[in-house]
């Protein structure tokens, strides 16, 4: 028996929500998705911002094809010198406009980046307390989920990591919760899950100052 793609989706794909959209997308171009019936949809998700320059962007497609013609996956952990990787690392370092953020460790996802940053913070400071914001979301792995600021994400997976505290995004008065026990504060410049909230430059300046005073690292998630 030959299954349709929809049947394969329902039979073999582990569900991630109670009511998936289940659109069968056959192609994408620019801001549009096209289903198996040819109907077009404006893509307001964009792969959660992965496709932020549009689907099948000609410059991106060319870069991918050029790289495939040279080589694809070689090795992780920085063992080999790979031209695209080292050029991107240089560009990222230069984009920070600082002298102390001078090296890059690449990961496959934002969640992995958060996990790596938490491990580094614990190792560097010797402390275990982390502070994040209420309603924040930093990923679904064990460590990243522990610092989530919404209990709805966490209650099915407890016990999680201990020594987690929360502050309100943009509230300078809350910064007193950062103490010498704090390994790191992790925060989004734009709090996406909390409703696309931003904070003033003075808030982030005060946050940076407080972390310096307490010997806590400051982790910026995207």
Regions inferred by a protein language model and the residue ranges of each:
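Glycine-rich loop-to-alpha-helix module at the N-terminal edge of alpha/beta enzyme cores
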Residues: 40-127, 131
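Active-site and channel-lining beta-strand-loop segments
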Residues: 22-44
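Active-site-adjacent loop/helix segments that line or gate small-molecule/cofactor pockets in enzymes
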Residues: 1-29, 84-85
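PLP-dependent aspartate aminotransferase-fold enzymes
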Residues: 90-187, 191-193, 205
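Active-site flanking residues adjacent to catalytic metal/cofactor-binding acidic residues
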Residues: 42, 187, 220-222
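Hydrophobic "anchor" residues on beta-strands that sit immediately upstream
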Residues: 39, 184, 217-218
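Short, small-residue-enriched loops and turns at beta-alpha junctions
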Residues: 51-52, 81, 173-174, 192-197
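Catalytic PLP-binding core of fold-type I/II PLP enzymes
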Residues: 197-222
């Amino acid at each position: 028996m030959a299954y349709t793609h929809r049947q394969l989706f329902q039979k073999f794909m582990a569900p991630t929500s109670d009511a998936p959209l289940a659109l069968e997308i056959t192609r994408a171009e620019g801001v549009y998705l096209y289903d198996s019936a040819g109907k077009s949809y404006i893509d307001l998700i964009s792969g959660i911002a992965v496709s932020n320059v549009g689907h099948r962007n000609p410059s991106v497609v060319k870069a991918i094809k050029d790289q495939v013609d040279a080589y694809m996956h070689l090795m992780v952990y920085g063992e080999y010198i790979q031209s695209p990787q080292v050029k991107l690392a240089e560009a990222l370092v230069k984009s920070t406009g600082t002298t102390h953020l001078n090296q890059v460790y690449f990961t496959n996802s934002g969640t992995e980046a958060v996990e790596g940053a938490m491990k580094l913070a614990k190792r560097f400071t010797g402390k275990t307390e982390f502070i994040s914001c209420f309603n924040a979301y930093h990923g679904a792995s064990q460590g990243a989920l522990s610092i989530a600021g919404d209990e709805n994400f966490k209650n099915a997976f407890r016990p999680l990591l201990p020594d987690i505290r929360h502050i309100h995004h943009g509230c300078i008065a809350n910064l007193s919760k950062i103490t010498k026990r704090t390994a790191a504060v992790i925060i989004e410049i734009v709090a996406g899950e909390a409703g696309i909230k931003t904070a003033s430059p003075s808030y982030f300046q005060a946050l940076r100052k407080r972390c310096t005073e307490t010997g806590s690292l400051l982790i910026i998630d995207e």
